[in-house]
């Protein structure tokens, strides 16, 4: 009798163990199978190749950095500037909210447009000009020499009063000359531009971006966007500053290239150049 009870107890305990542990084993195996299938499915979806559309041209308009502004200090103090010699920016849009409120508080906003120096609108159709817009017949062949001579001529001119066609051509001239500089010289070009215009370092990012994007501009898209989005005064200031700066800067940064080209320069040109680093100039009474 006792043996029969022990057998019954052991049989019942084994059955309880199987009932308690069985579902756990099955659950683990199910979850393991599920994770492996998920892993396989995720791998398979990541390996699926999505067809790529090539040669798709962007139709959106290019974003142009804001034009560098050097606001007139008289305007910032809340007074209208009536000086004919002030070459600072006089557009009210350049003022902060506080400065504009100060100007309104002084009741000076009722002045004429001439005192605010508001520039005339430009011809937006010239953003993408044709050869007919410039009306040139039998013009001379454009060479590097003629390009530099043209830049030297316009650097000494007042371009504030030129017509839209000439201003648009001057923007193209600037873009062409920017691309004659090596890419490593663009930061130096930017620094010289800031110094000439007395602009702060807060304007450096936008000025450098303009030079970089003009340098890599293909098809004149960025050049056209500048014409469309910048006002006439900003274009005039930028072009004028660039033409002065570009003719004074080295267009190459490689010392090997510079020294090699200096070797070929005519004597009259070499006499006016400072000695290259590492070179020594000897006078008649110098001794070794």
Curated annotation (Swiss-Prot):
Q: Where is this region: Disordered?
A: 1-49
Q: Where is this region: Oligomerization?
A: 94-112
Q: Where is this region: Interaction with the nucleoprotein?
A: 180-197
ZnF (C3H1-type) ranges: 72-90
Q: Give an example GO molecular function.
A: zinc ion binding
Q: Which Pfam families match?
A: Transcript_VP30
Give the Polar residues compositional bias ranges: 15-28
Domain of life, per the record? Viruses
Cite the record's Basic and acidic residues compositional bias ranges: 30-41
Report the record's Gene Ontology biological process terms: symbiont-mediated suppression of host innate immune response
Annotated keywords: Activator, Host cytoplasm, Host-virus interaction, Inhibition of host innate immune response by virus, Metal-binding, Phosphoprotein, RNA-binding, Suppressor of RNA silencing, Transcription, Viral immunoevasion, Viral nucleoprotein, Virion, Zinc, Zinc-finger
Q: Where is this region: RNA-binding?
A: 26-40
Q: Cellular component per GO?
A: host cell cytoplasm; viral nucleocapsid
Q: Output the PTM entry.
A: Phosphorylated by host. Phosphorylation negatively regulates the transcription activation. Phosphorylation and dephosphorylation take place in viral inclusion bodies and are largely influenced by the presence of NP. Dephosphorylated by host PPP2R5C; this dephosphorylation enhances viral transcription and is mediated by NP.
Purpose of the protein: Multifunctional protein that acts as a viral transcriptional activator. Promotes read-through of an RNA hairpin in the NP open reading frame to enhance viral transcription. Mechanistically, nonphosphorylated VP30 hexamers form a ternary complex with the viral leader RNA. Clamps the RNA template and the complex VP35-polymerase L together, thereby increasing the polymerase affinity for the RNA template to increase transcription initiation despite the presence of RNA secondary structures. Also assists stop-start transcription at gene junctions to promote transcription of downstream genes.
Assembly and oligomerization: Homohexamer; hexamerization is essential for RNA binding. Interacts with the nucleoprotein/NP; this interaction plays both essential and inhibitory roles in viral RNA synthesis. Interacts with VP35. Interacts with host STAU1. Interacts (via C-terminus) with host RBBP6 isoform 1. Interacts with host DICER1; this interaction prevents TARBP2/TRBP binding to DICER1 and thus allows the virus to counteract host RNA silencing.
Please state which protein family the record places this protein in.
Belongs to the filoviridae transcriptional activator VP30 family.
| Protein name as annotated | Transcriptional activator VP30
Organism of origin: Sudan ebolavirus (strain Human/Uganda/Gulu/2000)
């Amino acid at each position: 009798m006792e043996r029969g009870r022990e057998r019954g107890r052991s049989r019942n305990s084994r059955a309880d163990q199987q009932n308690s542990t069985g579902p756990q084993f099955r659950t683990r195996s199910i979850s393991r199978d599920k994770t492996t299938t998920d892993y396989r499915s995720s791998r398979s979806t990541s390996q699926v190749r999505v067809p790529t559309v090539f040669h798709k041209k962007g139709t959106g308009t290019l974003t142009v950095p804001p034009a560098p502004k050097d606001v007139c200090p008289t305007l910032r103090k809340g007074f209208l500037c009536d000086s004919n010699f002030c070459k600072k920016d006089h557009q009210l849009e350049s003022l902060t909210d506080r400065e504009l409120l100060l100007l309104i508080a002084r009741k000076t906003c009722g002045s004429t447009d001439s005192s605010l120096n508001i520039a005339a609108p430009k011809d937006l159709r010239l953003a993408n000009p044709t050869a007919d817009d410039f009306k040139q017949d039998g013009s001379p062949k454009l060479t590097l020499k003629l390009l530099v001579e043209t830049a030297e001529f316009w650097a000494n001119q007042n371009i504030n009063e030129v017509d839209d066609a000439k201003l648009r051509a001057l923007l193209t001239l600037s873009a062409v000359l920017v691309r004659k500089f090596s890419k490593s010289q663009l930061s130096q070009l930017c620094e010289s531009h800031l110094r000439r215009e007395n602009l702060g370092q807060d304007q450096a990012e936008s000025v450098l971006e303009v030079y970089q994007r003009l340098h890599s501009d293909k098809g004149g898209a960025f050049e056209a966007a500048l014409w469309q989005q910048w006002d006439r005064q900003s274009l005039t200031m930028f072009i004028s500053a660039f033409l002065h700066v570009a003719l004074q800067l080295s267009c190459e940064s490689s010392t090997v290239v510079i020294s090699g080209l200096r070797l070929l320069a005519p004597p009259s040109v070499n006499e006016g150049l400072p000695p290259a680093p590492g070179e020594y100039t000897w006078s008649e009474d110098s001794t070794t």
